[in-house]
Design a protein with these regions (language model features):
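Bacterial N-terminal signal peptides
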Residues: 1-9
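Extracellular-facing segments of soluble proteins and assemblies that are Gly/Ser/Thr-biased and enriched
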Residues: 100-150
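Surface-exposed loop/turn elements that mediate protein-protein interactions on large endomembrane-trafficking
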Residues: 69-90, 140-157, 196-209
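Acidic, small-residue rich beta-repeat scaffolds with periodic aromatic anchors
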Residues: 14-46, 50-64, 70, 165-270
Length: 270
């Protein structure tokens, strides 16, 4: 399974291994995002991102400084970091590296139930790269609670990317608003755990599907794991059945998938 290409597509906003290479971010990442108009907040909320001084990553490459993310209620209000700062995660409990965010990969408003429904704030951040080029990428989704005039985290997940892991928010199509994750299995035949979370009526994400992939690690498929598994995902959720047109993602190089086909239940682009 080849690495996915690009951070965003027209159908999905994805955590992309190719977008997370150990390079210095080309432009300063400090920014502010006005949330008042898009969320119709009672107070003038905004997302604030502050970038620290440049550092070296764990491969001794130049890297951007640590990011401080917070939500500020007006220009003079306190900046609250807890709602947008997930707990730090290391590969193992005894691992010394702190995986604080250094790369702002995505900060935008998304519409899981269409443009006329309530939006969510999507944040994707990446840690420093380790010596082997791996990186912890954290994905968060937040909604706005008008009754309490505050933002709350409704989804949080982090993973690496060296083994084709991915966390993807689906922006449109039959799975619109879902979050799909692909993470490698630790034992033969070395496929992936595919997990689908959907937004419930209560406003929180809940798991609706988990299964072992038909896709295998290093199988030569140019598609991202989630794309190659899309027929299986949609079939198990009752959104697609054999005989209907196959889902047609990009072919892995930004070009349309002209001839989608199934091989051992996984989607390939010929």
């Amino acid at each position: 399974m080849a690495l996915a290409v690009g951070l965003m597509s027209t159908t999905a906003i994805a955590q992309s291994p190719a977008a997370s290479s150990p390079t210095v971010h080309p432009t300063p990442q400090s920014m502010q995002l006005d949330l008042e108009k898009m969320f119709h907040t009672r107070s003038p909320w905004r997302l604030v991102v502050i970038e620290g001084m440049p550092v070296k990553d764990y491969g001794e490459n130049d890297a951007p400084g640590a990011l401080t993310l917070c939500l500020q209620r007006g220009p003079t209000g306190p900046c609250l970091s807890d709602p947008v700062t997930p707990p730090l995660r290391a590969p193992t409990p005894d691992y010394a590296i702190a995986w604080e965010p250094h790369y702002l990969l995505t900060a935008k408003v998304v519409y899981p139930q269409g443009p006329k429904a309530a939006p969510l704030l999507l944040l994707v951040t990446g840690s420093l790269n380790s010596g082997d080029g791996d990186q912890i990428v954290a994905t968060q989704l937040l909604d706005y609670d008008s009754g309490h005039d505050e933002f709350r985290r409704v989804y949080r997940k982090s993973t690496g990317h060296n083994n084709n892991q991915e966390i993807r928010f689906i922006a449109d199509g039959p799975l619109r608003g879902s979050v799909i994750t692909a993470e490698p299995q630790e034992h033969p035949p070395y496929g992936y755990w595919i997990v689908v979370n959907t937004l419930s009526r209560a406003g929180a994400y809940r798991q609706v599907l988990r299964y072992r992939s038909a896709t295998r690690y290093n199988d030569g498929n140019t598609l991202a794991v989630i794309d190659s598994e899309m027929p299986n995902i949609e079939r198990q959720l009752g959104l697609w059945k054999p005989g209907e047109p196959l889902p047609t993602p990009s072919a892995g190089d930004g070009k349309p998938c002209i001839k989608p086909t199934l091989r051992h239940s996984a989607l390939w682009c010929e």
